[in-house]
Amino acid sequence: MAEKFTQHTGLVVPLDAANVDTDAIIPKQFLQKVTRTGFGAHLFNDWRFLDDKGEQPNPEFVLNFPEYQGASILLARENFGCGSSREHAPWALTDYGFKVVIAPSFADIFYGNSFNNQLLPVTLSDEEVDEMFALVKANPGIRFEVDLEAQVVKAGDKSYSFSIDAFRRHCMLNGLDSIGLTLQHEDAIAAYEKKQPAFMG
């Protein structure tokens, strides 16, 4: 079972860039691991650090600004997560501590992979995202409240409605990953197996 997602209130960091691809999110040289942990250290590695080893933080990259330390909501521009289909991208984001990404649009494969890893991708209009960027930049350290049950983001004095596919919403609200979904039908699977002839194994 995955962690349930109902509501989340968190610090917002504005990544004012469009077409952020998966190689920027987690560069290919860090993909050797097969577990989901440890990727956060290399999130946006080529942007966060001035050296290949990740020892010299880039002071001009927004994730390194003191006011955004501990951010759990990423605000981005259109076509976030484009490029190759690596599932390591949402792994890196969640391992770093992100729970939500808000953008005008997402690459399809990244969008699906996010739900598989309990990372909520929230799609809003360009105008709404523009408003959020202005709000965050004017108020560094602001926190947004994301309510998946109500499908609303509360940002400052405004509320923004978003839409999520009913099945994906159900899975996130109940903490159901592919294993959890299978276990929901455990009794039916066991009953089916009992009916099978012994020679079928």
Curated annotation (Swiss-Prot):
- What reaction(s) does this enzyme catalyze? (2R,3S)-3-isopropylmalate = (2S)-2-isopropylmalate
Q: What Gene Ontology terms for biological process does this UniProt record contain?
A: L-leucine biosynthetic process
Q: Which residues form a coiled coil?
A: none
> What EC designation does it have?
4.2.1.33
Q: Which domain of life is it from?
A: Bacteria
Biological pathway = Amino-acid biosynthesis; L-leucine biosynthesis; L-leucine from 3-methyl-2-oxobutanoate: step 2/4
Q: Which HAMAP family match?
A: LeuD_type1 (MF_01031)
Q: What does this protein do?
A: Catalyzes the isomerization between 2-isopropylmalate and 3-isopropylmalate, via the formation of 2-isopropylmaleate.
UniProt family annotation = Belongs to the LeuD family. LeuD type 1 subfamily.
Quaternary arrangement and interactors, per the entry?
Heterodimer of LeuC and LeuD.
What is this protein called in UniProt? 3-isopropylmalate dehydratase small subunit
**What organism does the record attribute this protein to?**
Cronobacter sakazakii (strain ATCC BAA-894)
- Kindly list the organism's lineage: Bacteria, Pseudomonadati, Pseudomonadota, Gammaproteobacteria, Enterobacterales
Q: Which gene encodes it?
A: leuD
